[in-house]
């Protein structure tokens, strides 16, 4: 039975990832006044299936000088971690109701750094290594603000369990009470998932394709799927943290529809940002974090610590 539960979580995620690639190409196409993919199937709807067939039937070549075991383990680890992070997300009921769901998600997103580092190092290519080092520095840096923002939100929430956020936001969304945090969180998730304008790891002009430059066929597809699964997961997490949908136990489907629509809106915002903004320079990226976001998040964290203490004496309003 548990296997069916896992499959009922993984298969929709993989389908969503497949069609997100199509949505991205369509959105970028229309924003650049062109059609996007429109040959395979009606309106290009079968393009993701054609892409998957092409990638998984291709021969997976690898450089002769690469470290075989790490080269193969890295994409498997990336995809496994990307799918594992969905486990504690309440939609409205999580697959496993963890007591410390938020900490689990932070730990998993930190582990994802290893797959990037291994892939860059095992490829034995200088471009892949530079791309991997950039990705790791960026991911680790932005995780600092993500963790502090999460702490601030959870202090208002009163629990590390993600399901509690639904109850907390019954009356008002957290985005209204903590909008500076929500803005910084959204920008940090862009950086965390290596998306434009923070996609320095894939700077075509200097690094070809970044840490996955030596990958082809199946392993490349796994990295690609991991990246897009992470994008959807981060947007789902944002929707739970700041745009909590009201949950009626009698009609859980309404919560799910609400949640999916919010996640979709945030994901399309990601694509919109990609079409609109140029890439940051590396020093600007680091300055934004260490000189702007970190002091602000620390100050807001102090505020979120003191606010519940100050209001503790006020009796609850029924």
Curated annotation (Swiss-Prot):
Core subunit of respiratory chain NADH dehydrogenase (Complex I) which is composed of 45 different subunits. Its EC number is 7.1.1.2. GO terms for molecular function: NADH dehydrogenase (ubiquinone) activity. Its main location: mitochondrion. This is NADH-ubiquinone oxidoreductase chain 1. InterPro entries: NADH_UbQ_OxRdtase_su1/FPO, NADH_UbQ_OxRdtase_su1_CS. The chain crosses the membrane at residues 2-22, 68-88, 100-120, 146-166, 171-191, 223-243, 253-273, 294-314. Core subunit of the mitochondrial membrane respiratory chain NADH dehydrogenase (Complex I) which catalyzes electron transfer from NADH through the respiratory chain, using ubiquinone as an electron acceptor. Essential for the catalytic activity and assembly of complex I. GO terms for biological process: aerobic respiration; mitochondrial electron transport, NADH to ubiquinone; mitochondrial respiratory chain complex I assembly. Keywords: Electron transport, Membrane, Mitochondrion, Mitochondrion inner membrane, NAD, Respiratory chain, Translocase, Transmembrane, Transmembrane helix, Transport, Ubiquinone. It comes from Sus scrofa (Pig). It catalyses: a ubiquinone + NADH + 5 H(+)(in) = a ubiquinol + NAD(+) + 4 H(+)(out). It comes from the Eukaryota. One of its GO terms (cellular component) is mitochondrial inner membrane. The keyword Transmembrane applies. Belongs to the complex I subunit 1 family. It is a multi-pass membrane protein. It is found in: Mitochondrion inner membrane. PROSITE patterns: COMPLEX1_ND1_1, COMPLEX1_ND1_2.
């Amino acid at each position: 039975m548990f296997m069916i539960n896992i499959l009922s979580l993984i298969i929709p995620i993989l389908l969503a990832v497949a069609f997100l690639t199509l949505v991205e190409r369509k959105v970028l196409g229309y924003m650049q006044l062109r059609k996007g993919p429109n040959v395979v199937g009606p309106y290009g709807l079968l393009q993701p299936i054609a892409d998957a067939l092409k990638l998984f039937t291709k021969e997976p070549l690898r450089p002769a000088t690469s470290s075989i075991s790490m080269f193969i383990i890295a994409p498997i680890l990336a995809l496994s971690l990307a799918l594992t992070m969905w486990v504690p997300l309440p939609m409205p009921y999580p697959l496993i109701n963890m007591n410390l769901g938020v900490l689990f998600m932070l730990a998993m997103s930190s582990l994802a750094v290893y797959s990037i580092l291994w892939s860059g190092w095992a490829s034995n290519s200088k471009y892949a290594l530079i791309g991997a080092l950039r990705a790791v520095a960026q991911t680790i840096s932005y995780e600092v603000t993500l963790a502090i923002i999460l702490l601030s939100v959870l202090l208002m929430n009163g629990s590390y369990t993600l399901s509690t956020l639904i109850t907390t936001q019954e009356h008002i969304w957290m985005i209204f009470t903590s909008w500076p945090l929500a803005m910084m969180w959204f920008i940090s998730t862009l950086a965390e998932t290596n998306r434009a304008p923070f996609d320095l790891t894939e700077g075509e002009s200097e690094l070809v394709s970044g840490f996955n430059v030596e990958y082809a066929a199946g392993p490349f597809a796994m990295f690609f799927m991991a990246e897009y699964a992470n994008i959807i997961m981060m947007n789902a997490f944002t929707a739970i943290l700041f745009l909590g949908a009201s949950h009626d136990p009698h009609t859980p489907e309404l919560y799910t529809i609400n949640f999916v629509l919010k996640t979709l809106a945030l994901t399309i915002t990601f694509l919109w940002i990609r079409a609109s903004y140029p890439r940051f320079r590396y020093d600007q990226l680091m300055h934004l974090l260490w000189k702007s976001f970190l002091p602000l998040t620390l100050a807001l964290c102090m505020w979120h610590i003191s606010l519940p203490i100050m209001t503790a004496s006020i009796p609850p309003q029924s």
